[in-house]
Amino acid sequence: LGVFSASKTADGKKFEPLLIEGEKIESVCRLRIDQICFTNKRIIFFDNKLFSKKKVRVFLPYKSIEGFAIREVSMFNPDSSLSLMTSSKVFDLEFTKDTDMLEIQALLSKYLCA
């Protein structure tokens, strides 16, 4: 499981039932509230709100992502974040401080720039 060391920060078992034929988990990372899974076909995560009981599964094929932005850890913000831009919405995801965002950037570039 996982080509990148960022995958060691979370367990991907909860994503395995969601995979389609031929899909493989590349990396699973901890988000501030939940987890995110990068596969060879798409990104899967749960769009949770901190004080909401609603949990929405988001399946985002790489081909629907128009761009992304990464904010690294800084003195005033201990968490890194990733913004995924689609034609209809921007998904802002907050990662825990131990996530290697350079590896996330490399993974996204691999599928978005191919």
Describe every region a protein language model picked out.
Residues 19-35, 39-90, 110:
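Phosphoinositide-binding peripheral membrane targeting modules
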Residues 86-103:
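Canonical phosphoinositide-binding patch of PH/PH-like domains
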